[in-house]
């Protein structure tokens, strides 16, 4: 076995170092953060804005995103409406006439935010998209209570928005109630609740109330039909529902017309 002297080892090391120095050094290049990191450090509002901009530029993305994102629960929708209503009430100026033009101009943006939210959410609880009568009624009841709490003003022009909301709620009510015409099992009709809604709205929901009264008048026929159905399907039970309802125009699509007002 060959034994290397110190001088030989030193020479070999020098030759090796010389080879390294002749190699092309790969230097780093500046670049932005990876997309995953950018998303991690972006706040929710930024991501929301970016997503909407991408959908506007690439409409096909909307279908894919709808297929991925889960629909919000009813509780979430109602909570959103309540928060918007709180923001509206908190935006009133301190002191002064809260029914005057100045007050309306101060709260107008928050007022419209409530209407826009209703405009987006109500159709999600109407057939044919939503066919569950009880769920539809529950949401419409909550939405009606929100409209009841919208402020009114001395200037009748400022009250057009609320009147239109009642009109649309009435139509949605009619659409949901008409689901019962073909149902073999009919839930308990919430007549008292709708009467209270109509009273609070100053008879602006009378059309839906009259329709519900007509349903109640035909209730013996309905129950006879239901009894026959139960005899052939004994496992089915009557659905009991004590909540209320409301919203829309004759064909249930009236919320689309809200855009001309807001």
From Swiss-Prot:
Biological process, per Gene Ontology: nuclear protein quality control by the ubiquitin-proteasome system; proteasome localization
Q: Mind listing the GO molecular function terms for this protein? A: identical protein binding; proteasome binding; sterol binding
Indicate where this protein resides in the cell.
Nucleus envelope
- List cellular component terms (GO): chromatin; nuclear envelope; nuclear periphery; nucleus
Using the chain's own numbering, where are the disulfide bonds? none
Q: How is it modified after translation?
A: The N-terminal part (residues 1 to 72) is polyubiquitinated by rhp6, which is required for the interaction with the proteasome.
Biological role: Together with nucleoporin alm1, tethers the proteasome to the nuclear envelope. Involved in ubiquitin-mediated protein degradation and facilitates the degradation of nuclear proteins like mitotic cyclin and cut2. Required for normal progression of anaphase.
Q: How does it assemble?
A: Binds the proteasome.
Q: Tell me which family the UniProt entry assigns to this protein.
A: Belongs to the cut8/STS1 family.
Q: What is this protein called?
A: Tethering factor for nuclear proteasome cut8
Origin organism is Schizosaccharomyces pombe (strain 972 / ATCC 24843) (Fission yeast)
């Amino acid at each position: 076995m060959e034994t290397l002297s110190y001088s030989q080892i030193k020479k070999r090391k020098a030759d090796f170092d010389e080879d390294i120095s002749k190699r092309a050094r790969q230097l780093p290049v500046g670049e932005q953060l990876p997309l995953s990191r950018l998303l991690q450090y972006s706040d929710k509002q930024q991501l929301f804005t970016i997503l909407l901009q991408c959908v506007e530029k690439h409409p096909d993305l909307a279908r894919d995103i709808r297929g991925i994102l889960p629909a919000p629960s009813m509780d979430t929708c109602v909570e959103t409406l309540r928060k918007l209503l709180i923001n509206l009430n908190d935006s009133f100026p301190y002191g002064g006439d809260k029914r005057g033009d100045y007050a309306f101009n101060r709260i107008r943006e928050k007022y419209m935010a409530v209407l826009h939210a209703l405009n987006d959410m109500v159709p999600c609880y109407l057939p044919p998209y939503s066919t569950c009568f009880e769920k539809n009624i529950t949401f419409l009841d909550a939405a009606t209570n929100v409209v009841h709490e919208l402020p009114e003003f001395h200037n009748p022009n400022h009250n057009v928005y609320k009147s239109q909301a009642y009109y649309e709620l009435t139509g949605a009510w009619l659409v949901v109630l008409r689901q019962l015409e073909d149902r073999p099992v009919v839930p308990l009709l919430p007549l008292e609740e709708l009467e209270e809604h109509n009273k609070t709205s100053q008879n602006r929901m009378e059309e839906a109330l009259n329709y519900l009264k007509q349903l109640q008048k035909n209730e013996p026929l309905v129950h006879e039909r239901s009894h026959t159905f139960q005899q052939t399907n004994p496992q089915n039970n009557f659905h009991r529902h004590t909540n209320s309802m409301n919203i829309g125009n004759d064909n249930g699509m009236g919320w689309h017309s809200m855009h001309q007002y807001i």
